[in-house]
From Swiss-Prot:
Record GO terms (molecular function): hormone activity; prolactin receptor binding
Species: Rattus norvegicus
Keyword Flavoprotein annotated: no
Descriptive protein name: Prolactin-8A9
Gene, per the UniProt record: Prl8a9
Any one Gene Ontology cellular component term annotated for this protein: extracellular space
SUPFAM superfamilies: 4-helical cytokines
Residues in the signal sequence: 1-30
UniProt keyword list: Disulfide bond, Glycoprotein, Hormone, Secreted, Signal
Amino acid sequence: MELPLSQAQFSGTFLMLAVSNMLLWEKVSSIPACLAEEGGCWNPIVETFNSAMQRGETLRNLADQLYTELYHNQFSSEQFLALNSKLIRRDKTAVRAGTYCHSTLSNSPDGETKHADVETEKYLKMLINFVGAWISPLYHLVIELSAMQDVPETILSKAKDIEENKRELLDDLKWILTKVYPTAEMKEEFPSWEHLSFLKSSNKDSKFLAMFNLSKCIYNETYYILFYLRTLKCHITGKDC
């Protein structure tokens, strides 16, 4: 039976709407998990990056405070000023402790490269190993400080807070990796810290040499962490570029 023209047009329009809705549904269902909220969309990956960056800011402030405290508190100021003086005189041991950090970072991922996504995955893994490199040294720092006499609570509490924030930042980065690259294989390669034996030594000067190295490295490297977090957030989420 031939349909009247108006009815045929209506049926055709209905079919087009149905197909359009189906395609729209397929497109929406392919978008990564994003929870609808009033005023926009809540993206867990973006929020985890925001959380990681907030921890990075906290680490920078804590590292700055610990660094300053160790230089000016009576507990450690004499040893730190002596080490700084040796550093200026180019004493080999002091130069090594004052300028060398066992964790290193390469250049940031290049967004113009043909394999930008591969590069981004690579640098996310590298940042995980970079942050993870300080988990063990900070753990031992807290243990050794807790066992030393006359340790100011301000120094011990900051060391504990830095360790806690490092662990939480590492958890954030690992979570991002599993969500953005679910099939990625992550091999944790945390380099050993050469000053660990100094920190665990019964010799007080050796302990302070290790703290001199750790505090300088933690202080300087928080800036790199924040830079890499911003770069990776831009590459992965397209936000805050």
